[in-house]
Amino acid sequence: MTKQTLTQLEQHDLFLRRHIGPDSNQQQAMLNFVGAESLEDLTAQIVPESIRLSQDLSIGDSCGEAEGIAYIRGLADQNQVFKSYIGMGYYGTQVPNVILRNVFENPGWYTAYTPYQPEIAQGRLEAILNFQQVSMDLTGLDLASASLLDEATAAAEAMALAKRVSKAKKANIFFVADDVFPQTLDVVKTRAECFGFEVVVGPASEAVNYELFGALFQYTNRFGQITDFTELFATLRAKNVIVTVAADIMSLVLLKSPGSMGADVVFGSAQRFGVPMGFGGPHAAFFVARDEHKRSMPGRIIGVSKDARGNRALRMAMQTREQHIRREKANSNICTAQILLANMASFYAVFHGPDGLKTIASRINRFADILAAGLQAKGVSLVNSTWFDTISIKGLDVAAVNARALAAEMNLRFDADGTVGVSLDETTLRTDIEALFDVILGAGHGLDVAALDAQIVSQGSQSIPAALVRQDAILSHPTFNRYQSETEMMRYIKRLESKDLALNYSMISLGSCTMKLNAAVEMLPVSWPEFANMHPFSPLDQAKGYTQLIEELSTWLVNITGYDAVCIQPNSGAQGEYAGLLAIKKYHESRGDAHRNICLIPQSAHGTNPASAQLAGMQVVVTACDKQGNVDLDDLKTKAAEVAGNLSCIMITYPSTHGVYEESIREICDIVHQHGGQVYLDGANMNAQVGLTSPGFIGADVSHLNLHKTFAIPHGGGGPGMGPIGVKSHLAPFVAGHVVVKPGRESDHNGAVSAAPYGSAGILPISWMYIKLLGSNGLKKSTQTALLNANYVMKKLSEHYPVLFRGRNDRVAHECIIDLRPLKEASGVTEMDIAKRLNDYGFHAPTMSFPVAGTLMIEPTESESKVELDRFIDAMVSIRAEIAKVESGEWPVDNNPLHNAPHTMADIMDPEFDTRPYSREVAVFPSAAVRTNKFWPTVNRIDDVYGDRNLMCSCAPLSDYE
C-alpha cells in the first residue's frame, strides 16, 4: 500500500518531469559535480541578486497532459469555422494526409534546425530546392529564395530590392497599384516610412506618370481581375523601374507567367499548396527574381555545390548577403524563415505533379465560371470581366446577403463600397456553389450546376483570356513526375528525412538557439481543424477560442517578461526586433523627437540586431566589449554622451551573447535612459530568465520573445518562428496595428509588420500548452535546469578546452563558449574540422564562431538528460584526444579524421581508404555510443567556394536522370 498522497498520485507535475531531461538522481549528481547544494543554491551563485525576482510567477500550477488537452479542446470548440470565401491571400486547401502525417506531424521534419551544417541536412535541402524549382517554373524567373515570412513582408522586401538595384538612382517613389491586397499595402507603407520612400497608390495604368524606382502589381488582383501587363511592364522597365508582382501560386498553374510579361521580381504566398490557413499562418512566401539581381535577394537561398569527393551536394548559397555576416549592411534582417511550410508546399507539388496541379486549378476555375454564369444569367453585375477563382459583385443588398451567408455558416468578402467578393478554392464542392446561389440570390433561383457546367463546356470559357493562358510546360523535372502514388511519396519523404539530423536523433546544442523539447502534446492542437482552418479575417465573434487563447497567452507573457502589454503580430524574432524598434521610433516621434535615430549596439550582438536597426531607419553605433565579454561601460558612457541628442535606443541581449549574466545590466539601462534613449532587450536568451528575472524588472522598455526558442515552438528546419514583443505601458500605443482586423486596441491605427493581425497564430497553441502544462514552478525549474546543464557541460569540458567567458563564481548562464583558437594555432585543426567531426559522433555542431571567431557556443537546454550530456561530453573529449594526435605528428594536419570529416558509407567502402593513417573504425565508429546508434552523413564536406562561384539553385538538369 503506497503512502503517497492523492495529490502525488494524480501526477500534476508529470509533464514537468518529462520535459526536463535529468531526473532527480541525475540532477543531484550534477549539482554535486558543479559544487551546488540545490537548484536554488546554483541560481543564487549565478544570477545577480539585484535582478533576481523576489516573487514567483503567477501563471498557476502545472497540470497534466489530459487536463491541458481538455482545456484547449474547450477553446478550440469556441471557434466557429465557417466556410470561407473571403480570399485575400488565404484559401481553403486539402493537406494531403501523406504530407500531414509524414512531414507536418513528424519530429524528423519539424525539430531540425536551419541547415548551417549541410552535410547532415541534405534531405530538407533537397525539399527546399524543389520549392525553389516550383517557384521558378511558375513565375518564369531565374532565381528563387528558400522562403520568406508571408506575402506582405515579401512585398516589402521586393520594394527594398527595387531600391537597391534600380538604375533610377534619384527616384524615391514606389508605386503600388490600388487593387493589391490591403494588408500588403499596409506592410509596404510601414516599411517605406522607415526607409523614407514615398508610396504612391493608384490605378495600375497610372504608374507611367511618375518617376519611380519600383512598382508593385497584383496578378490576379484583389477583385479577381486578370490583367496582361506586358506592355505596361515594358514601358516601366524602359524607364529603369523595377517591376514587382504579387502573384497567386495556384493561378500560375494556368496563367501566363509574370516573368514572361517582363516582371523583375515575383512573390506571393504558397499557402494554398497544402498549408492550412491557421488564422493567418504560418505560411511560406515564395520570392523569385531575375538572375541579375541575385546578390540583392533577401533571405536564404539553397544552391548546388560538390563535396570533397566531387559528388553533388546542397548548401545555403551566397550567405555573405545575410545578416549573420553583413549585419547592418545585409539585404534583409531575415534569420528564421518558413522552411517547414515551404517543405509542405514543395511536397504538395511533388505529390500532385504538374497534371494534378492543373486539374485542381482547372476545377477551381470551372467552379468560378459556373458561379459567374449563374449570377449573370440572373442579371447580377460583376466587377471583374476575367477571373481565375474570385468573383466580385456589385449592386447586391449587402445586409440581406450577409445575413443569409451567416445563417448558412459561410463568410464572404464585403468591401466598404458595397462590393461583395467570393473566392473559391481547392475545397469547393458542387454543393457549395448551390449554397452560394442561395445566399447571393435567395431561394427559388432555379439554377442547376450541372446544366451551367454543360453550357460552359459547350460554349467555352472566356474567364482567362487566350493571351494569358499558360503555354509553357511546368514541373517537367522527374522529381515532380515520379511520386504520385502514396507509397512512393511516403518513401520519398522518408528517404529525405533519413538524411537529416534532428532532435529526434540527438541533442542539438546550438548556442543562442535553445533547441529544447517540442513535446508531442504541445503539437497536437495545431492540426485540429478548429485552429488550422480558420481564415485570419473571419469575424472575431467566430474566433472566440483563438481570441481567448491569445489573451491568456499574452497575459502569461506579460507576467513572465515584466512588461505591461504584448503584441503577438511579428512572425519571427527578427520581425519582432523590427516591430519593437518601430514602437520606439514612433514613441520618439510622438514627443517631437523624430531626430532620435541612433541605435547603440554592442559588438557582440546578434547579426539581426544591426540589420533590424537599419530596417527601422536607424543609424548603428557599435559599442565595445571588455575582455570578459561584457559591455564596456566606459565606452558606452562616452558614446551615449556623444550622441545623447540623437540617441534612440540600445539593443542588448541578456544574458549576454557570451553566456553570462552581466552584473552591470541595470547600470547599462540607466545610462541609456539618462540620455533620452530606450532599452531594447533582445529575447534570444530568455530561456535563462523565465521565473528568475525579467526584462521589465531589469529596466528594459521592449523585447521580442522567440516563441520558437524559449516557448517550445519547433524550429522546423528553418522556421516557422514567432517573435511577439512585450512593451512597457508608454510604448503600448505604438505597437503594430492592422488595416483589416481591428480588435479595438489603442494601437489599431498603426501600420502592420506582418500580413496577418496575429502573425502565425496557428502555432500559438504550442506555446500556450507549454506554459499551461509547466505552470509557474515548472517554468522556473526549466530555467534552473538549463543553467545546471550548461554549467555541468562547461565544467566537464573545461578540463579539456579553455572556456572563454564566465560570470560570477566562475559560472555561466544557460550556454558556454569553448575557445578553439589555441588548439588551432598548436595543431592546425580548425573549428570547422571539429564541427564536422561531431557529425561522425552523431551530433549537430554547436554554434560556430559566434560571438567570437574560432569558438563553439554550447547550449544544452533543460530537456537533455545527463546520459545525453555525457555522450556529447565524451565525444568532445574524444575529439580532443584526436587533436592531440595531430599535435604530436602521429596524424598529418591534412589527412586525419578531423580534416576529412564527416565520413560517409562511400568512404569506408573505398579501397583507397587504406592509404589513410587511421582506420575505418576510427572514421565512422569513434565511440561505443555510435556503434549502437549510427547516423550516417550522406555527403562529405561541402565546397562552399565552388558553390558560390558556380551558382545553381534549381533541381538537377534532366540529363542527370538519364
Swiss-Prot record:
Alphabetical GO biological process terms: glycine decarboxylation via glycine cleavage system
Residue list for modification N6-(pyridoxal phosphate)lysine: K709
UniProt GO cellular component terms: cytosol; glycine cleavage complex
One Pfam assignment: GDC-P
Protein family according to the UniProt entry: Belongs to the GcvP family.
Subunit structure: The glycine cleavage system is composed of four proteins: P, T, L and H.
Protein name per UniProt: Glycine dehydrogenase (decarboxylating)
Lineage: Bacteria, Pseudomonadati, Pseudomonadota, Gammaproteobacteria, Alteromonadales
